[in-house]
Amino acid sequence: MAYRDDTYSGGFSQPVFDSQSTFKQVMDAMARPGSIAEITVAATPPAPMGPAAGAIALTLADHDTPVHLSPAMIEAGVQSWLAFHTGALVTDDRNEAAFAFVEAGGQMPPLSTFATGTQDYPDRSTTVVLELTALAGGEPLQLVGPGIDSAMEIAPSGLPQHFDCMWRENVALFPRGVDLILAAGTKILCLPRTTKVTKKGA
């Protein structure tokens, strides 16, 4: 594996503290689907991986958690950066990945190609981190489900075409299914598999 100059930089300055802080912020966001949260700890991975996605990768990935990266991220050196800072192994098999990362504007694979867990072990599934251009300014979507009072509206910009249909198929697998973290810059928005998504007015 070739290492580049940016392989060794951009990690957490205080790995234990920074990982704990980021983990709490991600878990809080996952418990409040649709809410936009700020990842306050700095991480500077090689582009096109953004700072929030980078901090999440540093926090959640290790030698026991296979990670899937988009081809653009591998080409940009994210695989080497992740290996140096976390020891995580990158897998080409999306069904083996504990976590997956797709850059903004990248080709989002069908969610069904990731690990969706089993009826007995639904937690053995992939958490997908999808980067977007922004978490606002897109087509309005309505969310309902646990952690949401009545209903909530979001409007992420840059979601895959027919995302609502893709997500509906994922929700139908419950308790199986993938969980999704949308990231833009230093901000995230979480969609656990329990959250139903519909186009506003549909």
Residue ranges and their predicted role:
Residues 1-66, 70-73, 84, 185-187, ...:
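N-terminal, charge-rich interaction modules
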